[in-house]
């Protein structure tokens, strides 16, 4: 049976084995998928040993940049993202690295939530790997404005500059953000600590702005609570992004695109009762 896994450290919390088991059952694909706790000091060796038999893998924190350096070839979106979250074993044992995070977020927004980016004003919060991974897909949708804001303005400006060839994007510090926006995506990890980036309330237009937090939890995240209190039209969390990036990886491995909606529903139900 073909073997797949997710590499991470820590990894016990991962929902990927459940997601891919549900995808496999739904599509009739015979495969085994497990979580692998990779050592912090030898990810490359650990991954290579898995791929002596393994066919593919997902990669989560803190190994996405190491996976980028490990592979023999990269997809264009992985090259742009500077990180790899999906590994595919090719004929002859070569490894190809891809990044499905941006595609997953975009699909969750446009297909699941019905949010369009074309000609919209979009604010991305943060300048780390999570935001880097979604910039190219977002710019491909041709928003009217794409602003990257970060606590350290220089990081946001530099990141925006790397993607300027793909469309109109600029960077600034949180204090320099002037709204309102049609869509605000929080790509910082502030919600994990119960915090919210320091933004002016004018970034949200009451009854119009959609707010999306890449984080998710049983209850609304700190960012989504903040947004709802200020009249955001809708608040969305990152559980759909998790399922959609997994569906894209499954498609890369098996050539079959699973239906994500029933899997997302199962996870949402499990999260609410867990």
Curated annotation (Swiss-Prot):
GO terms for molecular function: NADP binding; shikimate 3-dehydrogenase (NADP+) activity. The active site is at 64 (proton acceptor). NADP(+) binds at residues 76, 126-130, 150-155, 214, 238. One of its GO terms (biological process) is shikimate metabolic process. Pathway: Metabolic intermediate biosynthesis; chorismate biosynthesis; chorismate from D-erythrose 4-phosphate and phosphoenolpyruvate: step 4/7. Its EC number is 1.1.1.25. It catalyses: shikimate + NADP(+) = 3-dehydroshikimate + NADPH + H(+). One of its GO terms (cellular component) is cytosol. InterPro entries: Aminoacid_DH-like_N_sf, NAD(P)-bd_dom_sf, SDH_C, Shikimate_DH, Shikimate_DH-bd_N, Shikimate_DH_fam, Shikm_DH/Glu-tRNA_Rdtase. This is Shikimate dehydrogenase (NADP(+)). It comes from Pseudomonas paraeruginosa (strain DSM 24068 / PA7).
